[in-house]
Amino acid sequence: MRRFIPIIGLMLAVPSGAQQHDPAMHQQHMAATNHSQNKASDGRQLVKFPEQMKEHTLANMRDHLLALQEIQMALANSDYDRAADVAEARLGMTALTAHGAHDSSKFMPKGMQDAGSAMHRGASRFATIAKDASVTGEIKPAVGALAEVMGACVSCHTGYRLQ
């Protein structure tokens, strides 16, 4: 047992790859992927937005990613009320008006609209469950609800792409 303690200490001291983010490596990977993958081979449905609406929608999606990161950080810090507040304000049903969802939904196919609605409803559901976790201390239901939110994101991004 004593032989394993230094090894465990070393493992904890070395940062894992999952915690590190190297933007240059990501850009290299994306460049290589773009060169080897023709857009014609992209099986996702192309959704055409007016340029200004496309930029607005992409900015909203980037904000969604940032909100998900903030939610995960709040969960890691056991700040379940903060996680709930971010989820509802930035991703939940409350966020629909702030993000101009009604305007952009006019350009979306029904499946894309459904995935977006599922994400927003799921985020509001997560917010309620996270608030419960702040009282009960039970985090598993909140983590499961957050996974459902991410599932809606994955579903949409797997099926659709903007032009």
Model-derived features: positions:
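Generic leucine side-chain signal with a strong bias for well-ordered alpha-helical environments
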Residues: 10-12, 75
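Sec-dependent signal peptide recognition
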Residues: 2-9
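N-terminal signal peptide c-region/cleavage motif recognized by signal peptidases
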Residues: 13-17
